[in-house]
UniProtKB/Swiss-Prot annotation:
The lineage of its organism: Archaea, Methanobacteriati, Methanobacteriota, Stenosarchaea group, Halobacteria. Belongs to the UPF0175 family. PANTHER family: UPF0175 PROTEIN SSL1255. This is UPF0175 protein VNG_0066H. Pfam families: UPF0175. Transmembrane segments: none annotated.
């Protein structure tokens, strides 16, 4: 067990946490509360990876959808409009008809 792991286990036990995961979750929540720029960056990363929708990312960032769109534009991140190409649409339709 590494020194860091042992320290985390000790802090979790001393703090009354069920396990280190619970303690780390609380620590991350507190970090994001204190540093809103990290919260925004996390939301951008989750949006870019496809883990969350635009609306959910804005909610996570604590900003309006329009403000989040502006942030994406400021960072040079293109948004997928969600439109299908003709080929994708035909493929979906064919699958649906089967």
């Amino acid at each position: 067990m590494s020194g860091l792991t042992a320290d985390l286990d000790a802090v979790a036990a001393a703090g009354g946490y069920d396990d280190t995961d619970a303690m780390v979750e609380e620590a991350v929540r507190e970090l994001l509360r204190r540093r809103p720029e990290l919260r925004l960056s996390l939301a951008v990363e989750k949006y870019q990876s496809g883990a969350v929708s635009l609306n959910r990312a804005a909610e996570l960032a604590g900003v309006s959808v329009e403000a989040f769109k502006d942030e994406l534009a400021d960072r040079g991140i293109d948004r997928d409009a969600g439109f299908l190409t003709d080929a994708q649409r035909d493929d979906h339709l064919q699958t649906f008809m089967e």
